[in-house]
């Protein structure tokens, strides 16, 4: 089944903005139509869903999102792993593709939505303060945790999956609207293959490899 190039979640707001542009241009002035028209063009760009080819091996983790690696660190994770693990933080600007993909094939065995604040997603510590949505993906022999974090502009996290769903490698499962951050938590048996500052492509860039 061919996937739409524009995410359906954006149809409503895109349609409203272009209708405002048409009405403004028709009843008031073409100059009035410029701002909503440009906003509509940007929203088409923001809600894009480009085709990605998943070529990673079964033991390789792909990036869940487009963006830039902000941090790689050891942390104590107390909602899914309940132990120290490594966290990779990816910042998504308003110009990145914002759909999110499963880094690994497996079953969703954990799902948690947490209300919070809307601080800028690039600031340190927002993963503990901002609104966020997490899923745990269980491959059978290995598990990972992915957390999507809202930002100062990103006020809504959209999920298209439920607890118990089976995800394919690189499968779309959600998005964060208008600038955000994604965190990937992995066990010690994963060899991290990216570095701070690296640019990532969701579903294509290999960020880690299971070594056991």
Task: Annotate the PLM regions.
Residues 1-212:
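Contiguous, well-folded functional domains in the mature portion of proteins
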